[in-house]
Structures are given as structure tokens and as C-alpha cells.
């Protein structure tokens, strides 16, 4: 069975866009792959974090994974910082990465420009750690969005470089992009991706938003003036985005939804979608609360840590042996 790895930062509550584009799809692949789902808290601290808030968000994200439908009997759910192999392998890959290729990363350049108080070295060395997250589990498949595509290209380059120098030690992962319609955009500016870090609360719906508040956000979402409910990303980005959300939460095809609302106005469509979103959040948040407040969550994370430590150990030792680290045993 092939291995799939995915990591999410505990830097805020995921949105319904994260749910439709990633979390929901993870549930569907649990029977087909050996899955490792990682809460990448060491990536989160590449920018300043409040200690207590970060701890809370780690637990929240774990409960969100489980509320989504991640099954700990099928998949490994764990916290990055509890598996030392990540940073150990990350350092090894950092030594074969060049400053130039790290500085060319678009995310580094974007975040560095916003830091008037100096650029943390962790922002620069983020990609080798991300590569290590992936390779220590002999990962075959990595589902990523467009924003991580460049990092994945670097990961594959680092694997090629390591294998060229030290013989074929690492598995070269393949990238899996989101399904068509899986990319959810901002509600007020549908030309940009929905983001949990957006300053405008009306642009996104958090998985922990009050359901009635989320419904209002749908009703006030940007559309257009022609009143035709049709999927057309280029010419009708607003209504196309709402169709993606409708389809993602109901599993109805966009074509069926278009047919259902043929001749109907945006008011009727938005009203129905707002109820769908509200009902989804009520149900989701009930599951979330049951996991967040349960001791079972810690047991699940403890077991995930043990499985991840065991799975990563073999690859880490191969890397160390290849580079001549430690003692010969």
C-alpha cells in the first residue's frame, strides 16, 4: 500500500475551504493509502506565536481532523514536534539546500517583505523541514494546493540531490492537486483563495464559526448582476465559488445544482446554501466538541506519536548512515 502524507499548521481554525479542498478528501483516501496526518506545529513557530494559544490550536486542529472523519484505526494522526525525526531529517536536507533556491521561494519572499523587524531564519529553512516531514515516511503521494506547489518541486529536487550523493535512500513523492471545484475562494473577493488568516472576517467561514453568522456571510457573498446560476470561473467567479461550496457540502454535482436552480434567482440559491452551511456547521461542531473535550483525544495522539516515531525511525537511520553521522553499529 502506498503512503500519503499531509500536514496542516495549527495557526488558526481551518475554513470550509480547507474542509472541501483537503480535509474531506482525506477521509475518502483512508482505505486506499497508509495515511499520515500531521499537525505541523514546528512550522507554525516560524512566525511569533502565543504559547497558550498555540497549545489550544494544536488540540483544536486534532479534534477537527477527527470530526471530519479521520479514523485513527486507519490513519496516523500526530503532532510534528512529538516526533524528533522531523527536525533531525530537516537539518540533513538543509545542508544540501542552497541559499539561492530557498530565497527564490515565493512564500519566503512574500512573508519576508512583511517583516519590518527582521526576517527569521526559520522562514528561510521552512522548505527543507517540509521536505523532511514528507520523506521520513517514504511518502508516495502528497496532496497540496497551488500555494505549496513550489515547495513540492523543491522537495523533489532535494530528494534527487540526496539520492544522487548518497545512493537511492529516499522515495521521491508525487504531487496530487485538489479535485476540480475543490478550490474555495474568498466570499467578498472570489479572485483570491479563501484564507483563515484574512483580515476581513466576511471573506471566509471558519469551521468553528457560529452557524447563524456563517449563514449571513453566504447571503452577503459577492455574485454578479445577471442572475443566472451557472459555473463559470472566469466570467462569474462569485456564483461559481458558491456552487463549489454547495457541491462540496452536499456531494451533488455542479451540473445537477445548475439544473435544480434553472430559472431561479440568486436570493433563492443563497438562501438554500446558507441553510446547508448552517446545518453542516451545527453537525460538525457537535462532533468537534465531543472530541475536543474527551480524554480519548490524548490517547489517539499518543498512539499516533508512537506509530509515527516507529515509521520515521528507519528512514532517519538510513539518512544518517548515508551521510556518515554517529557511530557505526
UniProtKB/Swiss-Prot annotation:
Span of the annotated motif 'HIGH' region: 10-18
Annotated binding of L-tryptophan, by residue: 133
Gene Ontology molecular-function annotations: ATP binding; tryptophan-tRNA ligase activity
Binding, ATP: 9-11, 17-18, 145-147, 184, 193-197
Entry-linked Pfam families: tRNA-synt_1b (PF00579)
GO terms of biological process kind: tryptophanyl-tRNA aminoacylation
Entries under CDD domains matching the protein: TrpRS_core (cd00806)
Entry-linked PROSITE patterns: AA_TRNA_LIGASE_I
UniProt-annotated location(s): Cytoplasm
Cited InterPro entries: aa-tRNA-synth_I_CS, aa-tRNA-synth_Ic, Rossmann-like_a/b/a_fold, Trp-tRNA-ligase, Trp-tRNA-ligase_bac-type, Trp-tRNA_synthetase
SUPFAM superfamilies: Nucleotidylyl transferase
Keyword S-adenosyl-L-methionine: no
A single Gene Ontology CC term: cytosol
Keywords, sorted A to Z: Aminoacyl-tRNA synthetase, ATP-binding, Cytoplasm, Ligase, Nucleotide-binding, Protein biosynthesis
Free-text function comment from the UniProt entry: Catalyzes the attachment of tryptophan to tRNA(Trp).
HAMAP family reported in the protein's UniProt record: Trp_tRNA_synth_B
Family statement drawn from the similarity comment of this UniProt entry: Belongs to the class-I aminoacyl-tRNA synthetase family.
Name this polypeptide is given: Tryptophan--tRNA ligase
